[in-house]
Amino acid sequence: LTLFMFLSLLCHGQSYKFFTTDRELSSSLINKIYQDRNGMIWIATEDGLNRYDGAKFIIYKHDPQNEHSLCHNYVRALYEDSKGRLFVGTYNGIQLYDPATDSFSARAQWEDGKTFDSNIMSILECRNGEIWVSGNNLCTITITQGKLTAHKPDLPIPTQMTDYMIEDRQHNLWVTQGENGIYRLSADNKSKHFLKQEKGMTIVDLYEDNYGDIYLATIGKGLLKYNQPAEEFIPILYKGKQNLPIKSICQISQNELCLG
């Protein structure tokens, strides 16, 4: 079964490379693909983390006898910060990849030394350098001599499962909570709740475009755009329909968004 493909754009055509679980990939269920600043391509799956250097794959999996192995095989989030550090978010915690030893840091711990075993949904570096993670807990991560520590800030929002995050141009943090809508957290720790009574709708992605406009991809309500003067999200209809399921948003040109 072919599951993963690289596409190279050439002057007179296109070339493809196909990879399968028979020989290369650890799983057919891919959660995230990311290329780091060194050109390495990382593929997060539900059964291990894969790294491709252009010639071969290396598969990383959990080894219960090695605390510097992947802490869980279900990998959902990958994030490279401004210092080039690669964070790996799993079903059971967050780690840093160490290229010098080709291994991973010990799992993050809370300030009291207890293991931070949160199911990590997303990772974000804010403009002030803070690293935020979402999942079972919405918190910040600090790094001291390679050790990760999780900090629980006092936030004016429910502590339930949080999914995706972005920081807008005004330094507001937007946090989605699935069927519970989306929260906007301002720098002065005030919050506003949007779409809190939208039944039959789940937010699965959010995006800020080049103009600073915020969009939500949803299952049940299609694409929504934030109207800043009215402080509300409005539907973007396709052929008069609002319920077209949208799962992903990216910008492909100055004036075009790609929806999936």
Give residue spans per PLM region.
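Carboxylate-rich, polar loop motifs that coordinate divalent cations or form catalytic acidic clusters
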Residues: L1-G260
